[in-house]
Amino acid sequence: MKHLLSILALFAIIISSGAEAATPARYSTDGDLMLPENWREWVFIGSPTSPDSMNSGEAYQPGFKYVYIDPESFAHWKKTGTFRNGTMIVQERLKVVEAEYMDNHALIPGDYIGLSAMVKDSKRYPDSIWGFFSFGRPPYGEQVPEIGSMDNLGCSGCHYEADQDWVFTRFYPVLLAAKPVF
């Protein structure tokens, strides 16, 4: 009996270790990505900023970029240093406002100006592994089609050159600090 229980316990461990956590990505029946729930409660990984004033008056995608990763994928990242299938990263853009702050010149976040997301799903996006989406300006769309496949480049044109698995990890100290060293 002891031997049987040991085998059953080992079998349960093997099955559970191969199971992936569910993705936070939800899709409509048409395949459009649904607006993620509570993304501002996810793990905040950084805020790259591209002000027009530092880019000859016209930055590519100007603004503060508040970037979040879903908690399950961040936990996976901390264990493996990889982005699991199902990872969702959300970027919310805000205007850059130049202001006086405590006797200093400062750049502070202004109004929300856009929301985008990328989802890692090797079955749904076999060419690029990641799907890219824009929910537009506030109020954000409830569901949106993919905007960046390898066929039309879009977001994937830049992300193809990213540091690791289509993600510009060098811009996110939270990811770099949490990445395990093997």
Regions found by a protein language model. Give the residues of each.
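Bacterial N-terminal signal peptides
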Residues: S6-S16
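Positively charged n-region of N-terminal signal peptides that target proteins for export
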Residues: M1-L5
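Active-site microenvironments that recognize anionic phosphate/pyrophosphate groups
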Residues: N55
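Boundary at the C-terminal end of the N-terminal hydrophobic targeting segment
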Residues: G18-A21
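Short, structured beta-strand/loop micro-motifs enriched in basic residues and often containing a Trp
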Residues: P62-F74
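Sequence context surrounding c-type heme c attachment/ligation sites in exported
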Residues: P24-V43, S47-D52, Q61, T80-F182
